[in-house]
Amino acid sequence: MKERLKVCDPMNVRRIEYMDIFRGIGIILMIMGHIWFGQIFDTFKAAFHMPMFFIISGFFFKHKSKEELSTFEFILKKAKTLLVPYLIFGIFHFLIYYFILGNHDFKPLFHLLSWNNNGLAIAGALWFLSALFIANVIYFIIDRFVHNIYIKLIIILLIAVFGNYLELLHPPFSLSAAFVGVGLMHIGFLLNRFQFTKEISFLLNLKILPFLALSAITVFLIFVNQHVNMRLGIYSNPLLFWFNATAATVLGINLSKKIEAVFSDTILCKFLIEIGEYSIVFVCLNQLVIQVLSKSVDGILLNKLLILSFSLLILFILSRFIFKTNLRFIVGKSIKFKDLIY
């Protein structure tokens, strides 16, 4: 399956299908976590399923000169694609929480506008959007104003390490996760920048035996480290967190490349690609869909698999509807004038 060369966002970043597949896998893991498939699964996926999205964001980060893109323009574009959906879906879920579910409590609205890593109405996953926005802005500013690569690395390391412990101060807007996200973005940026060097090319195109060996080591270390939760600032052993997040992401990229190669043009491959492409809708609406479906079934494994299947189907339909209609403004996509009059 060939790489699509179409522009995917205002930053002129090309879509790479194996990365959309990887996003799709990450989204499915996130939804499974919200359905709850047990502590063992939760420990496994939590080690990397949120870090991977920051790494992917860094992978596609492109250096821009002041003439190409001002700092204000960058912040505005990121606000459009991350903060606009954050606020729209956050208020949407609050209205359901308040008027339909009858919870006459304004605390979730307060949390939406402040300490959003807990207490949101229905869609707790929205914290990720504010964290990703802040991480992108910080990373852009560092890239724009710090030109020495070694000083840049030191600054990013200090921010990332500080982020591992910042939650002790309970900052608003998931700031601790954003600080860690800056470090994860730099990992993604370096993977992309040096992907054609011998060492990084080897890591991103593992043969079967190295792939299995690294998988075994990573899974073992994930369970050695135990519980990780970026939202709450829980990392257990920070060194193991950074290794596991990076190694699992590298393995995920390898797996996605293999899926693209083996299942090219199949329904499975196309489905994963579209989940990845429409991932923001899945992030914003999955918990509402899960809650609705969970009302009608009990918690046995078979029913959880049914909830997962129907959730993916419903979210897929909703995402296509939003992206293909004038509603796409709620996910930060522009609406052309002709779309409003025809």
Give, region by region, the residue ranges found by the protein language model.
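Alpha-helical transmembrane segments and their immediate juxtamembrane cytosolic regions
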Residues: 2-342
